[in-house]
């Protein structure tokens, strides 16, 4: 009979910024995960704060990256933005999930990074920041469903 191991707690490698003493100073979290793939296409993480996600996706499309920022739902789960969401900090996870065969292998090396993909994501996030800062939800502690 197969057994499933259920850990008593989850391990997350962090510097502690989601801890209560630091969380009060964090306005929002934008997690950029696996952004360097040449075939960049970002679906919408289902756990992310919708208002943050909407701003970034709208900005990306306005910059002409309609094939990058797509409306396909992505069920990531267990990613690095979870502790921030649990601390009540609005968070968005931009993660490349489709068709990257080198993920978590010894072949996942810097030569696989696309400067163009990094530029697209960096440009989009940078252009999104003023809208995020001006949004009524910025700095509040609503649920991730907004």
Sequence positions of predicted segments:
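Structural recognition of the beta-strand scaffold that forms the well-ordered cores
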Residues: 27-33, 91-95, 102
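His/Asp/Glu-rich mid-to-C-terminal helical/loop segments that flank catalytic regions of hydrolases
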Residues: 101-146
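Short glycine-rich, acidic/polar surface loops and turns
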Residues: 75-94
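Residue-level preference for alpha-helix termini and adjacent loops
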Residues: 25, 41, 83, 102, ...
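Acidic/histidine-rich catalytic neighborhood of metal-dependent amide-processing enzymes
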Residues: 1-55, 59, 67, 73-81
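Sec-exported extracytoplasmic/periplasmic mature domains
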Residues: 15-19, 57-61, 65, 86-89, ...
């Amino acid at each position: 009979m197969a057994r499933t191991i259920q850990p008593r707690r989850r391990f997350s490698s962090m510097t502690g910024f989601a801890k209560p003493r630091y969380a009060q100073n964090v306005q929002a979290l934008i997690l950029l995960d696996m952004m360097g793939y040449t075939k960049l296409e970002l679906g919408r993480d289902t756990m992310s704060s919708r208002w943050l996600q909407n701003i970034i996706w709208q900005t990306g499309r306005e910059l002409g990256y309609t094939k990058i920022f797509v409306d396909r739902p992505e069920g990531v789960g267990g990613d690095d933005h979870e502790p921030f969401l649990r601390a009540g900090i609005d968070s968005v996870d931009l993660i490349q999930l489709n068709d990257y065969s080198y993920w978590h292998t010894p072949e996942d090396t810097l030569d696989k990074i696309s400067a163009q993909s990094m530029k697209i994501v960096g440009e989009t996030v940078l252009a999104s920041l003023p809208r995020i800062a001006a949004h009524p939800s910025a700095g509040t502690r609503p649920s991730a469903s907004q």
